[in-house]
Amino acid sequence: MAKRTFESSLSKLEKITEELESGELSLEGSLKKFDEGIQLAQFCNEQLEGARAKVEILMKKDGKVQAVPFEEE
């Protein structure tokens, strides 16, 4: 089984969204796709939060470049 990545999960989530928006799925099929989509969205969100925690901004202070944590405004 292939390792789940952010990119593959996002692509699958986009496909599920298209399938749900098409209106061609049964109620049961729609619920299954919705559940799968929720799981994929949670995975993507976790990946984004992890990436955000790793982002650092390089600041020049006293002639030296220093890494500081990223803070949202």
Curated annotation (Swiss-Prot):
From its record, what is one biological process in GO terms?
DNA catabolic process
Q: Which reaction does it catalyse?
A: Exonucleolytic cleavage in either 5'- to 3'- or 3'- to 5'-direction to yield nucleoside 5'-phosphates
Recorded coiled-coil stretches: none
Q: What is its EC number?
A: 3.1.11.6
- Write out the entry's keywords from A to Z: Cytoplasm, Exonuclease, Hydrolase, Nuclease
Localization per record:
Cytoplasm
- SUPFAM superfamilies reported for this sequence: XseB-like
Please state what class of enzyme this protein is. Answer: hydrolase
Under the GO molecular function aspect, what terms does this record hold? exodeoxyribonuclease VII activity
User: Do the record's keywords include Ribonucleoprotein?
Assistant: no
User: GO CC: one term?
Assistant: cytosol
How is the subunit organization of this protein annotated in UniProt? Heterooligomer composed of large and small subunits.
Function, as annotated, reads:
Bidirectionally degrades single-stranded DNA into large acid-insoluble oligonucleotides, which are then degraded further into small acid-soluble oligonucleotides.
Family named by the database record: Belongs to the XseB family.
Name the UniProt record assigns to this protein: Exodeoxyribonuclease 7 small subunit
Which species is the source of this protein? Desulfotalea psychrophila (strain LSv54 / DSM 12343)
Q: Which gene does this sequence derive from? A: xseB
